[in-house]
Every structure is written in C-alpha cells, then in structure tokens.
Curated annotation (Swiss-Prot):
GO biological process terms on file: pentose-phosphate shunt, non-oxidative branch
Keyword Ribonucleoprotein on entry: no
Record's keyword terms, sorted: Isomerase
Function: Catalyzes the reversible conversion of ribose-5-phosphate to ribulose 5-phosphate.
Protein name according to UniProt: Ribose-5-phosphate isomerase A
Transmembrane feature ranges: none
Complex formation: Homodimer.
tRNA-binding keyword on record: no
Species this protein is from: Streptococcus pyogenes serotype M6 (strain ATCC BAA-946 / MGAS10394)
Alphabetized CDD domains for the sequence: RPI_A
Active site as annotated: 104
Enzyme Commission code: 5.3.1.6
Family: Belongs to the ribose 5-phosphate isomerase family.
Length: 227
C-alpha cells in the first residue's frame, strides 16, 4: 500500500514545471508528492512556490527547502496535488481524514488544475463508507452534534487522545457515519446551509484529474469538463 501511494505521489510531481505556484496537500499519499517536489528542488533546481494545506505539510515543506507563500499572498495556484479518502464515479470525493479539510478546500478553490493522488482502494461506487468529516465552530458544537444525531447521521467527535481534536483553524470535527451518500451534491448543500458548520469534507465537482495507483500500474482519470 505504501509503495502504491509513493508511485501516485511521484507521478503527480511530473506535472510540476518551473515557475509554478503549487498547492501542497496533506495526508499519507500527498506526503510523497511533497517529498518528490523537495527532491527536485534540491537536485534539479526546480523553481516553485508552495502553498500548504496544514501545519504538518508546512513543516514538511520547510524541512525540504521548498519556498512557501501564504494563501493570502497569491491570487491563483497553477496546480494542487492532494489525497482523497474516497472518490466516486462522478469525481466527487470525501476528504478530511487528516483533519485539514478547511485549508484543503481554501487552497483548492483558486487552483487551475486540481489533482488527487490515491491508491485503488479509494475508488468507490458510492461515497459514505468513509466517515464524512464536518468542521464546526466550538461554540454550539454539542447542540449541532445532537441535531446530527436526531437526523440519523451517527455523529462522533474526532478525538486526539482523551480530548476533542482541535484543527489548525481552532475548530472541532464531527465525523458522520452515513454508510452511503446517495446524492453528495444535495447533501453538501444541506451542510453548507447549516449554521455552525464551517466546512465539510465533500469535494464535489472540484477535481480535474485522479491519479490511481494499483498493483497493475498507474491510471490517470480525467474528470469531464463542466458544461
């Protein structure tokens, strides 16, 4: 599995060229993309500027000598590579297993080409077997938890040890155990309209390419262009 993740990450790095501003994703597969960019910066003199999606990735990139900029200092990103926890046949996905979904979505939004790197186990018919992360403000989080419970979403607070995990943006995460999300777009809109929800892990219609590594090799899937 580790080898497949590395292959996917290294393959994605081939899309990066001199002068690009690149979004650096978070998670076990995106890790290898960032490592490969670091190698190219050091060994090939690759000239890029990175925008990171978490404090973990910032630390990794700084250690590799990748120059970084804040999202607030750029207007567009040429290419972002990130992992995904599930991807369906319509190129909708669940992200946020690493608790970085808000920053990941903020970086994805001004990106011209958005690529996910996954191993074949992440490709699914329907989203929902992986718990859907919902980032919520701390104020009123318990009330919101009860709202989700009443709706049958089987919520649980993301924990770190004995305490609730606090994200880089100082929010909580409530994971929803939905089993199957029949209409991810409609459910995304529902969560978008829920007061107290900062962001959710449904990334619908955002990705341009999905690089899938399996024991048979690497496949690059292209999402159909909108319109």
């Amino acid at each position: 599995m580790k080898a497949l993740k590395k292959i996917a990450g290294v393959t994605a790095a081939q899309y990066v060229t001199d002068g690009m501003t690149i979004g650096l994703g978070t998670g076990s597969t995106a890790y290898y993309f960032v490592e490969e960019i670091g190698r190219r910066v050091k060994q090939e003199g690759l000239q890029v500027v990175g925008v990171t999606t978490s404090s973990v990735t910032s630390k990794q990139a700084e250690g590799l000598g990748i120059p970084l900029k804040s999202i607030d200092d750029i207007d567009s990103i040429d290419l972002t590579v990130d992992g995904a926890d599930e991807v369906d046949k319509d190129f909708n996905g669940i992200k946020g297993g690493g608790a970085a979904l808000l920053m990941e979505k903020i970086v994805a939004t001004p990106t011209k080409e958005y690529i996910w790197v996954v191993d074949a186990s992440k490709m699914v018919e329907h989203l929902g077997a992986f718990k859907l992360p919902v980032e919520v403000v701390q104020y009123g989080a318990d009330r919101l938890f009860r709202v989700f419970e009443k709706a049958g979403y089987k919520p649980s607070f993301r924990m770190k040890g004995d305490s609730r995990l606090v994200t880089d943006m100082q929010n909580y995460i409530i994971d929803l155990d939905l089993g199957c999300i029949k209409d991810p777009v409609a459910f995304g809109h529902l969560l978008d309209g829920t007061v107290g929800v900062v962001e959710h892990g449904l990334f619908n219609g955002m990705v341009d390419k999905v690089i899938v590594a399996s024991k048979d090799g690497v496949t690059v899937l292209e999402a159909p262009k909108a319109g």
